[in-house]
Amino acid sequence: MIRTPLRPLARILDARAQGMNPKGIERENLRLRREQARDAGRRRAEWRLLLLAALFFAGYAVIGARMGMLAATPVVESEPYAGEGISGERADVLDRNGRILATNLVTHSLYAEMRYMQDGRRAAHELARIFPDLDEEALARRLTDPDRRFYWIRSRVSPEQAQAAHDIGEPGLWLGPREMRLYPNGTLAAHVLGGTAYGQQGVTAAEIQGVAGLEYTADDRLSDPDLADVPLSLSLDLGVQSIVEEVLGSGIQMLHARAGSAIIMDAQTGEVVALASAPTFDPNDRPAPPTEGDPADSPLFNRAVQGLYELGSVMKAFAVAQALDLGLVTPQTMVNTRGPLRIGRFEINDFHDYGAQLSVEDVFVHSSNIGTAHLAQMIGPERQRDFLRQFGFLEALPIELPEARRALPQYPDRWTEVSAMTISYGHGLAVTPMHLAAAYAALVNGGTMVQPTLLRRPDTTPGPRVISPETSRIMRSLFRQVVTRGTASLGEVAGYGVGGKTGTADKPNPQGGYYDDRVVATFAGAFPMNDPRYVIIVTMDEPQETVGGVERRTAGWTVVPVAAEMVRRIAPVMGMRPQDPAVIDAELRLR
């Protein structure tokens, strides 16, 4: 029984009357009240803990349920930037031996989603450290622009850059997977491959499009999803291409030339085994096309198929071949070489005085302009024009490069007698080195035209006949003599029977006439000349060699040694064994 507190006097007296101690009763009452209060507080605390635990449990349950929903639901990106329907697949490009020239590599893009951006200025500062070419202030303005939802920072980043961007820890910076085009050999065969760029882009995919070279011409084939696993095989030989580019580059540097090009072509099939143009570029980091100045000054300019040049004396081969094929002359026919040769107000001279006359054989071997002009007179303008048309000199070449299709040869509107004479020794008709390669293949392969190609072509149908097999045989002998006793004596490569023709043409002056001290030097030939397998064309723009204190610009002193070095190095790579020079020359001796 709980006792009630005593009243001050009455209860004290009452307690004493009953024999109890009032103080003890009061202490007991106080103790009981404290226990009651303590029990009530404990019950309230227990209820509070239960309520707090229930709230925590409910909160965690909601978070867990939301996380489960997010994990089970596929990510939906912002519709304007998604990659649905965009294919980045692209077939590999291989050389003739299966070595990779172009392939795809998985990489990332870097972009910003403003709705998630926490600190745009900090992000811009950190990104500028990763990408030094970025304008930090301009980027900061874009990343903090409240009206902007999305911004491309980089369409392609390296794995190292992607990791560094991720480490910034900014929720508004996103990395999107995509494929990029990779050229593992750098500048090698750059002018053949051309390059690619991104077309339609999304954050998870980007369309790779060819913008130049073979990547452009074969774009539909390379981007066909059904053929993504079927590589495109080219006629190029990576080993030969590497040697040709190295030797050409060294030659240009040594001869202080402005530029140059080189072509190695199968004389029977027209397959281009190597094509080089210098200066060059890296298709992995393709420069922008020039917007002003001379396009030929750009490293993107493919001099082998775009450069239109008056090629000089290498064109004499066609005047001689036509005169022989028409039966107008034989190699021993004597031709007037007394100079100068005057036609109206025009005057034709030789580099050396060859006397009153030379045989057709020696006109070609010693490169007489006057003698060749007399042959052109015998042929006549109409027949000459028709003959050169058969060799493809009057139209663009149908090779698999878009740049070549825009290179239209330049020739006179009126093909007069004077035009025929100057064209016979390489002035007045501007063509590309690739035109010359295809035409020289026909001169040495027995007389049938070939169509130049950059694609692997194991089986070919012979082209139309342009000269007789006998004329081709005579031309092979004359080409060989140019090397053994003529203007290309520095082109001899023991055991490989090199033959060809030199050409040194004064460059046209845009103001009119020709420069006195600027030339285009060319060597056009084939090897081995007793059974021609490959045509070689080397052209340099403004080469110059100093010998004994004398400046020399002619092809015999400049491009011929470069061509010889190419043959010396590529012939073994192409599986060719040296032959006995006496046997080669015996087979080529004119009967």
Where are these regions (language model features)?
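Beta-lactam-recognizing serine transpeptidase/beta-lactamase-like catalytic domain environment
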Residues: L30-R33, A102, A262, A267-S313, ...
